[in-house]
């Protein structure tokens, strides 16, 4: 991004880093295109940072606390300068806002919660100062399913707001509860029947009934995996639609017909 742009630090979550790296790349590109000066959080020991959520979900509190402290050490210079932390994965990012205050002493987490945002929250909060130029994409209809953490923290409305910025795109939230995957819950053989039954309550039938040209937007990695496994439809993070819309916009402004 521009040297005089608003500084942000991106946290690439473990799931995104290894399974869908294109989402992290799109996040960086979208923020840079919006006029931000983007930093990527990293540790001195070169091992990728992790919020510790997977350890926490498994009851491994000491391991989760160790990862949390590694992350906070890397973020400390940014927190001290009040530089916002932005990420994509709801369970990971909102763990920093919610569980860290219980996991660690307040002296270690001071300032963290106030400077930590999911992408949708950050874009809505800063919409008056960011340079967000969007053009129509190939999609006219989007069906939206948000992660349970997004619903719990009411960021699902921000996702809908941001998607509605894309011209000629109609956004239809899917009336659904948990997809059933719930982190790694649905990955366990003993939970399979319960996991699929949860998905079949509303989400999976709704996705199967969609027009093939409707893009399915899923808020979390586990949500998108459950949708794929349960329906055969691929779901995308909304950052991909923003990236496409911004890329089209950039191409339009420069007279190009595409982008690399």
What are these regions (language model features)?
Residues 1-260:
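Iron-sulfur cluster-binding electron-transfer modules in prokaryotic oxidoreductases
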